[in-house]
Amino acid sequence: MNFTQSFKLALKSLKTSKMRAFLTMLGIIIGVGAVIVILSLGNGMTNMMNSEFEKMGANLIQVMTYGRGTGGTRDVDVEDLYELVDKYPQYLTGVTPYVSASAKVRYQTDDYDRTSVYGVSEAFFKEDTKGTMQGETLAEGRFLSYIDVDRHQNVCVIGDYLAQAAFRGDALGKTISLSGVPYTVIGVLSKSGDSSEGSADDVIYIPYENAQRMGTGTMMMGTGEMFLLTSTSRDTASAAKGIVEKRLYKTYQSSDYYMVMTSAEMMDAMNTMMNTMMIVLVAIAAISLVVGGIGIMNIMLVSVTERTREIGIRKSLGA
């Protein structure tokens, strides 16, 4: 029996037991498909996050504090960090509080429950780069000024999603309600992503003390305060981080009460987490491949056992 005859016989056997053949292949199909989908999604998410971190720049430093420390009687506040910026201009160029506000966003009769509201100072916008510390740029209008922040003005800068969804692209000078308080839109950020609800484009920036009065204090990693600083360049980021850590340790007397990370470290930590998650998910998906392989071996064994007599007759006839 030549190869062509063997192939035709195999196809005939598959057609005879269509359900058995389909179920045998299903395990392998699911396993291979799951691995491909997981790897594709994981790589896509990793690339997206790396792109977001690259937009921030390599000179961003994030500071989070969690209390008064072992022997301290006070927290480090933004004035302490302002002093650092003034004292070390060769390493640090700016600092701003970064307050996540618990605000209910409403325009006329529409609520925007997934819109993020953050309180920042005027230093959040960098005049030299014409963008924020996180890489966002203005499409129109202006950003918060020192006067806005110092006088607690009810003004805001909104993202592209809100500008389109609420104001149909004509947002400047319009009023939006934050927890019942009217805020005037003075600036609109450029579109940075898919401009969907809850995305990075669905954001509002207001003076940080206004945000604090809305009832906040819950930061990204527990109760405390969060600050953003910028170093003079990528090369000075590590030295700038050391200066900030030294100042925080002086107040808290323990590194357990604060965390300082550069944008490069944040990106590395995120990539490590994503890689670990992908390994776990791929391992789980690979179980389907193993189960599918065992299923194929089982069916092959059963098929051969069932057709032992037929195989013997064919061999005796010279097959």
Placement of each model-derived feature along the sequence:
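A short amphipathic helical element positioned immediately N-terminal to and/or at the very start
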Residues: 6-15, 80-85
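Hydrophobic alpha-helical transmembrane segments of multi-pass inner-membrane transport and secretion
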Residues: 17-45, 270-309
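Hydrophobic secondary-structure segments that place a key small or acidic residue at a functional site
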Residues: 98-99, 110-215, 239
